[in-house]
Every structure is written in structure tokens, then in C-alpha cells.
């Protein structure tokens, strides 16, 4: 009986001591920390101090930070605090907190530059602009070709930048809920708003009018006016959203959950949400270029699944070895087929699959644990990383592998291309890292720029979903049309530019599909165009590419 009585007593003593430590920590926090980190620890001028943000930081490091401060972030030192007091503060900030978030707090957080210092950036082609996240210095660079056109600060910048439909505005999220905007056409930082306390990702509706923000704390989708930053709709959620992505072909956005077996469909006009059940949660996913399927994987990493948006059901599932990192997958076209390649977290290989018939093609050993796969029609390679100091290049024709040495002991991570695809921007992910810029065809190193933890690079052509069919269409053009057509100059046949500015899209599609029928309707005496026998996906891809050469009324409109 004594043991039965003593055990609860022991627990009560321990719990009481811990509760006392938390109470002391709370008092110390309010006295020394609340003015910057917020009374409720949600953050104000300094980041939030909550378990989500602190769980990976060792206690020894936190003690050092509080005692000595962080000069780089203007956090003061607190040498007057004893080690015991600091430990009490740490126990408190690592304890659960109740966060009261509201639309009113979002409105109060809005900061817009009323009189920004503008400057004209020497932009030659907006489609070749690359935004670089330098996490170590909490900066974003605006680049074109080999040149840095501007830099600006953004605290706790993580990645996941999004471009407006025109490409002239960039939206920058931080994990602690802030979303900022930089205007390339004015060369200035427009302003920022705090949508939530812990942000997952941001997207824009296809018009660019609304920002769609998925949040983990509080669990919500926050819809903001992209110009005023004011909240338009606050939608509470009861699960952790994996990500939210817009559709370019209709007024919808799609999101999934890490912890719920559902797909959500947000109407970006009415903001109503409908749900469909799936067999298990999609922790990671991407939408195919023609917006017919969602390709997803679970946190368990055991299955690759394909969900049909027209049939509202899963149409394919396959066992996997290692969780595919589908948000980092890459898509291309070759000899009548569409492919995608995905890295696998903690596994030393990538896998290649056919899009649309969902057949496994090949496992390619990359010699280490990779995280990203990128490609572009201009380069013949898949560019990937393996956690080491070499860039891994996989030939798209035969899947042979070769490497490029960078700097010994550094870590290669993430490649991105400019819009033309002739330049590859590669990060060396170290505090004393670098941004390396290569010719994507010759593989010659063109420039080495020192950078502190450069991570994501973002380009409107490679990161905006509306351009995915365009890039595939360029590859269809090179294989099927290049012998007779030029994009802008008359060759054996009219240029794409002439065609799209003189014919209706339905006439163009009909001629490609049935040239032996359409030549008379178009006023030709004979048919000189061969029948290409394109699949519906090939036809949609080449049409998307051709329409890029249509004259635009607004020179700044992409």
C-alpha cells in the first residue's frame, strides 16, 4: 500500500516543483522578454517563443543566447540573470501557450510603406528575374543573369516566395506568420502583414488579387487582400495543412492535411470549401501541369498516390521505399511521353515515373541523400543534390550520372534556373556558403557569389504553375515542330508569333490535329503540314507554348 500511496505523492511533488518553476519563469518572462516577444509569446518585434519554434534548440544554446544576446538581431544580453533564472524562463517558453489570434490582430500588424524610397532596377526581362533567399543574413536578393540588382531584409525568411501573375511583385513568407511584398517595378519593399503565428505556406489566387495563407498556429486559412493586406476571410481548420496551391485554369485552390485523410477545395471567388475523402493523409503533393491530378505521398513514406480531380477519387497507388519529396519533384517531356522525377528523403536515389499512365521507369542512384530535383527544357540534365559537395547531373536521355565538383566540405542544395534556362543557380548551404551560377549546357562556372546559408531561388517561369505547360510545350516544339517553324521568324512555315496573332486558338488546335481538313478552311490551296498525331496532353502543351508569342496590350503583363 505504501508504494501505491508514495508514487502519486512523488508525482505531485515533481509536478508542484515544475509548476513553481513555470510560475517563476512566467514572471521573469513578463519582466524581461514580453516587450519584444509579446505578452502571450506570439512575438511582436521579435520572434514568437513557443514549443514549435524552440523544440530543436538545445538548452545550452538557449542559455547562451539569453545570457549573451544576439547582436545580429539586436537582442540584448541579460548578464544580470542567474543560470537558474534563465532555466526557469526556458521552461516557461517551452511550455504550451494559449494563443488568441483574430482578424483584429492581423489588421493591427499591417505595415505599409507610405513613402517608400523607389529606384529603377535595370530589368531586361522579368521572366529571367531570380529571387534568392539568404537565410543566414535574413535577406532576399533580386538577381538577373549574373547581377544582383537589389537586396532587402526580411526577418526569419524561410523560402516559398510567390510571384504575382505579372511577375513584378514578390510575396515573401516567414515561418512566424509574416508575409511581405517587394515591388520589382519600383525597386522597393512595399510592406508586410502578420497573418498568423506559425505559417506553413502562401499562394495567390490566379488573378493575383488574394493571398492564401495556410497556418498551423492557429490552425487556419487566412485570405488577405494582396494590395491592402487586410483580411478578407479567416477560415478555422481542425487539422495541420500540408500546403495550399492555386489552380491557374479555374478559380480554385487545393490543400491537403498532414493529419487528416481529406483534400480541400477552396473556391477563390466565394471562399467556400468542399472536401473529399482520401485513403490516407497527403503530407506532400504536387498538381500535374494540366491540373487533372494530385500526386501525393504520406508521412509514413510507404505509398505514392494519384488522385483524379475529375473523378474525385484515387486512381493509382504504389508502394514506395522512402518518402518521396514531391514538392521538390521535376517534370519534363521526351519522345511523346511526360515524366516526373522525385527525390526520397533519407534515401540515396531518385525515382523516375511516367505521368498519366503512372508507370515506374527507373531508380537512379545519386550517391547520397538528396532533397531537390530540378530541370528545364534548355538543359539536358536533371540537377540534384546528395548532401555532399558535388552537383549530381542525370542525363534525361539515358539516366547516366555525372558530377560537378564545387568546394570541398561544402553542401550543395537546390538548383534553380532563370526563365530562359541557360543559367543554373546552385546553393552551397553553409554559413560561409556561396551562390554558384553555371551555364546549364556547357556546365562552365560563370560566377561565385559568397552567401550565408543561401537556400531557395525563385523564378516566375519555374515556380508559377501556369508556366508548367509552357515549358513542356517548348520541349514538344523542339521535337515536333522545329524543323518547319520558328518562334518569331518566318521559316518554311509561318512563325508561331504570326500564327497566334492571326488565328483563333480553336483554329490553331484544329489545324494541328487535322491539317488535311483545315487547310481549305484557312484559305490554302494545298496542305503542306504533316499530321503529327499528338496526344491531348502534347496538343495542350504546344498550344500553351505558342500562346506565349501573342502580342500583349500591357508590356508588363506576363
Q: Which stretches of residues belong to each language-model region?
A:
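Gly/Gly-Pro-rich "capping" loops immediately C-terminal to redox-active cysteine motifs
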Residues: 26, 38, 42-70, 77, ...
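Positively charged n-region of N-terminal signal peptides that target proteins for export
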Residues: 1-4
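The canonical Cys-X-X-Cys-His
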Residues: 25-39, 89, 93, 140, ...
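Bacterial N-terminal signal peptides
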Residues: 7-16
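C-terminal capping alpha-helices of c-type cytochrome domains
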Residues: 60, 79-105, 506-507, 529-558
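Short linear capping/connector segments at secondary-structure termini
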Residues: 46-48, 525-530
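Predominantly soluble domains enriched in secretory-pathway, periplasmic, or organellar proteins
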Residues: 19-23, 31-32, 39, 60-71, ...
